[in-house]
C-alpha cells in the first residue's frame, strides 16, 4: 500500500498526505463558517446588502494583503505560517458570540481573511514547491478535490450543530485545531524557499487577464452562493435543513465533475470549456428559481 501511494504521489508522499488532510479539514471548516454567519445575520433581520458587505470582509483582506503574506511566509517558514494562522482563527472564532454587532463581525472576518490568506498561500506554496512536471497536475487536482469535498461537508456539519449558541463556533474552532495537529506531531519536511523576487500584482494581471478575471469571478460566485443561497431558500419557505442540503448537492456536483473536467481539458479547447461553464453557471440558477416545486429540476440545477 505504501509503495503504491509513494509511486503515485512521489517521494514526498507523507507530506502530501498531511497537506491533503489539512486541506480537507479547512474545507469543512470554511464550508461550515460561511453559511453559518450569513444565516445568523439573516435571522437577526439584517438586509442582504448588509450581509453581503459583511461577507466581502474576508476576500477584501486577501486582496489587500496579497503582497504581505509571501513576506511573512519567507520569514518564518511554511509550517509555522499555517500553525500561527490557525491559532489566530481559533481565537477569533470564539469572539463571534461575544461581539455580535455587524461592525465587529466585519472586523473579525477581515482579520480571519488575512489569517486565511496566510495559511492558504503557505499551503499552495508548499504543495507546488515539492511538485515537478511529472506529478504537478495530479497533485493540484487531488488538493483541490480534497478541499472541495471538505467544503461540501461543511453544510452537513451545520445541519447537525444548528446556528444557535456557541456550539457551531466550538466545532469550527476544533476543526482549526485538528488541522494543525499533523503539522505539529508528524515529521514532515518544511522545504526551504528560494529567494525570488515576486512579480508586481499589476504585471501578473496584465500577463494573464482572463485567468485572473476568471479566478476572481469564481471565488466571488462560490462565496456568494454559499452565503446567500440558504437565505434565498428560507425566504421561499424552505426549512434551513433543506436549504443546507441543496448547498451540499451543489458542492458534491463540483467534486464529481473535477476529474471529468480534467479529462475534457486535455481533449477540448480550454477557452471554449471555460465559456461553456460560465453559461451553465448563469442559466442554472434561473432554471432553479422557476421550478421551486420540482425536486428533480432543483437538484439537477444545483448539481
Model-predicted regions and their roles:
Residues 10-59, 210-211, 219-233, 243:
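Helix-loop boundary and gating motifs at the non-cytosolic
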Residues 59-67, 151-152, 251-259:
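Residue-level signature of mid-helix packing/kink "hotspots" within the transmembrane helices
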Residues 65-77, 162, 258-269:
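Helix-to-loop junctions at the C-terminal end of transmembrane segments
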Residues 77, 98-103, 269, 291-293:
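Helix-breaking motifs and short loop linkers at transmembrane-helix boundaries and internal kinks
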Residues 80-94, 272-287:
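Structural signature of the two symmetry-related core transmembrane helices
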Residues 103-111, 296-302:
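Paired small-residue
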Residues 110-145:
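Cytoplasmic helix-loop-helix junction between adjacent transmembrane helices
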Residues 173-192:
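C-terminal membrane-cytosol helix-exit motif in multi-pass small-molecule transporters
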Amino acid at each position: 500500500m505504501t509503495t503504491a501511494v509513494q509511486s503515485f504521489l512521489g517521494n514526498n508522499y507523507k507530506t502530501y498526505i498531511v497537506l491533503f488532510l489539512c486541506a480537507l479539514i479547512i474545507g469543512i471548516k470554511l464550508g461550515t463558517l460561511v453559511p453559518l454567519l450569513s444565516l445568523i445575520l439573516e435571522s437577526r433581520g439584517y438586509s442582504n446588502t448588509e450581509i453581503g458587505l459583511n461577507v466581502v470582509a474576508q476576500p477584501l483582506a486577501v486582496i489587500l494583503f496579497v503582497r504581505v503574506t509571501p513576506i511573512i511566509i519567507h520569514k518564518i517558514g511554511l509550517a509555522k505560517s499555517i500553525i500561527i494562522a490557525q491559532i489566530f482563527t481559533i481565537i477569533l472564532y470564539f469572539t463571534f458570540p461575544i461581539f455580535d454587532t455587524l461592525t465587529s463581525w466585519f472586523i473579525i472576518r477581515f482579520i480571519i481573511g488575512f489569517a486565511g490568506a496566510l495559511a492558504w498561500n503557505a499551503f499552495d506554496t508548499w504543495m507546488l514547491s515539492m511538485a515537478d512536471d511529472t506529478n504537478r497536475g495530479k497533485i493540484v487536482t487531488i488538493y483541490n478535490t480534497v478541499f472541495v469535498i471538505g467544503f461540501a461537508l461543511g453544510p452537513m456539519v451545520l445541519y447537525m450543530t444548528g446556528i444557535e449558541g456557541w456550539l457551531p463556533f466550538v466545532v469550527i474552532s476544533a476543526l482549526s485545531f485538528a488541522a494543525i495537529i499533523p503539522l505539529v506531531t508528524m515529521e514532515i519536511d518544511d522545504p526551504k524557499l528560494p529567494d525570488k523576487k515576486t512579480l508586481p500584482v499589476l504585471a501578473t494581471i496584465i500577463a494573464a487577464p482572463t485567468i485572473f478575471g476568471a479566478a476572481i469571478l469564481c471565488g466571488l460566485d462560490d462565496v456568494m452562493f454559499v452565503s446567500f443561497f440558504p437565505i434565498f431558500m428560507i425566504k421561499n419557505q424552505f426549512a434551513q435543513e433543506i436549504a443546507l442540503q441543496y448547498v451540499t448537492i451543489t458542492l458534491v456536483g463540483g467534486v464529481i465533475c473535477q476529474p471529468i473536467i480534467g479529462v475534457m481539458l486535455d481533449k477540448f479547447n480550454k477557452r471554449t470549456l471555460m465559456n461553456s461553464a460560465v453559461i451553465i453557471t448563469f442559466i442554472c440558477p434561473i432554471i432553479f428559481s422557476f421550478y421551486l416545486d420540482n425536486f428533480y429540476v432543483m437538484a439537477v440545477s444545483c448539481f
